[in-house]
């Protein structure tokens, strides 16, 4: 270790000198950042868990990764569900042109009775065990994902997807609904959206989320691309 970040090295030696794991991040909620927001905008609850990607390649192999690319070892917990969503599902049209996809969202953990979500500290403590490879089968069964985006794998690797967010979300919603009909457990949920027409409406939802003990909200443009940046 020498105290030099990957970002600094890439600035000196070139953008891709060291590979970095793609991740789209949010900016702080303030009026300056809202200058880029187009109304009606989309508001979602900011989830309080562990950021993750569930990746399925064109051969149907499934992998779960953290926001910095570390493998989250869940012993195939999401495999059947994700394959049913994307890979040659009997409930969907033949996906001959499928080249892989990435679900972007947050991992959360249910309590032992699977009746409520654990707080961030407790839940992420269990999920960190999955990163280390020490999570138990019983704990793994209680892991869920709240998903807010779907990106084609090729675009994810390239760092940009020009398909508008609302279109990406619509395709994800269509495929997920078909999968729910054949799944005993909804291991992956789609994060609900609320349209807003101005800053005041977004701020109201933000304050309501805080009052409920949530971390906050995320405000998005419906036509926004996915990009590997904040």
Map each language-model feature to its residues.
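Amphipathic alpha-helical
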Residues: 4-25, 189-230
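Covalent nucleotidyltransferase
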Residues: 36-185
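A short linear-motif detector with a strong N-terminal bias
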Residues: 33, 123-127, 195-198, 229
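Charged, flexible boundary elements
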Residues: 15-45
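Alpha-helix initiation/capping motif
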Residues: 5, 21-26, 30-33, 75, ...
